[in-house]
Regions:
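Short glycine-rich anion-binding loops that position phosphate/pyrophosphate groups of nucleotides
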Residues: 129-131, 153-155, 202-203
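NTP-dependent small-molecule kinase module
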Residues: 2-18, 23-24, 33-49, 70, ...
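Conserved lysine of the Walker
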Residues: 64
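A glycine- and Lys/Arg-enriched "phosphate-lid" helix/loop adjacent to the NTP-binding pocket
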Residues: 143-188
Length: 229
C-alpha cells in the first residue's frame, strides 16, 4: 500500500533542542501559567516557553488526545495526534490499517511518523497506546522530547472505551479482560516514561491539564514559566 509522506503546519524540519535554562520555573497562580502565543519560530518573551516536544503516552482511554489539545492550547504550540497523522497519510482508519495490512505494518509507519514529528518544532504529541512499547520510539522520544505517562486505572479506562468500536485490540470476546491484560503488560513499560501524571475519575480535562503543566513546570529544561507570568 502506498504511504505518502505528509507534514503539518507548524511542524517543520527544525531539530528540537532542549533549552538549558538555569533558573527555577515560576509558581502557578491557580489559573495556570497562561497561554503562550507563537510568533513564527519562537514564543513571545514573558510567556511559557516549551523547549522540547511533550509526548503523551499511556493506555487507550487515558485522555491523551483530550489533554493534549488543551495542553497545546495553553502553551500556544501545535497539537499533533500520531494516529491521526497515520490515518491521513494512509487514507484509512486505524482499524482498516490493522485489518488490511496488519499490526507490524502499522507499527512501522507509526515509528516513522513519530520520528519525523520529533524532528520538528516543540509541540504536544499524542501517541497511540502501543507506541511507547517499541524501544526505537522510546529512544527517539528520550533523545528529542520528553514522555509523560497519563496513568489511569482499569475501571477508568474501561468506562471510557467500553462503548467505542474503534479499538482493534479490544475486538475480542471479553474486551474488558483484554484491556486488563494489556494494562498489566504495558504498565511497566509506561513507567519508564520520564514523567508521570495520575489520571483520576471525576478530574476534568482542565484540571488534568493543570496537573500536567505543574509537572512540566518543575522541569525548566522542558517548560520555562517566567516569574511574572
Amino acid at each position: 500500500m502506498a504511504f505518502k509522506r505528509i507534514s503539518r503546519h507548524g511542524i517543520g524540519n527544525l531539530t528540537n533542542r532542549r533549552g538549558g535554562a538555569d533558573h527555577r520555573a515560576g509558581q502557578d497562580n491557580g489559573d495556570g501559567p497562561g497561554v503562550s502565543v507563537n510568533t513564527g519560530d519562537r514564543q513571545e518573551t514573558g510567556r511559557p516557553r516549551l523547549h522540547c516536544t511533550v509526548v503523551l503516552v499511556g493506555m487507550m482511554g487515558c485522555g491523551k488526545s483530550a489533554i493534549g489539545r488543551t495542553l497545546a492550547a495553553r502553551l500556544g504550540v501545535a497539537f499533533v495526534d500520531s494516529d491521526a497523522e497515520i490515518e491521513t497519510a494512509a487514507n484509512a482508519t486505524i482499524p482498516e490499517i490493522f485489518a488490511r495490512d496488519g499490526e507490524a505494518f502499522f507499527r512501522a509507519r507509526e515509528a516513522e511518523v513519530i520520528a519525523r514529528l520529533l524532528r520538528g518544532e516543540p509541540c504536544v504529541l499524542s501517541t497511540g497506546g502501543g507506541a511507547f512499547l517499541a524501544d526505537r520510539n522510546r529512544q527517539a522520544i528520550a533523545e528529542h522530547g520528553v514522555a509523560i505517562w497519563l496513568d489511569a486505572d482499569l475501571d477508568l479506562l474501561w468506562d471510557r472505551v467500553r462503548h467505542k468500536d474503534t479499538r482493534p485490540l479490544l475486538r475480542t470476546p471479553d474486551p474488558k479482560m483484554t484491556l486488563a491484560r494489556l494494562l498489566e503488560d504495558r504498565a511497566p513499560i509506561y513507567a519508564q516514561a520520564e514523567l508521570r501524571a495520575r489520571a483520576e475519575p471525576g478530574l476534568s480535562i482542565d484540571a488534568m491539564t493543570e496537573r500536567v503543566i505543574a509537572i512540566l513546570a518543575d522541569r525548566p529544561d522542558i517548560l520555562e514559566i517566567p516569574d511574572d507570568s
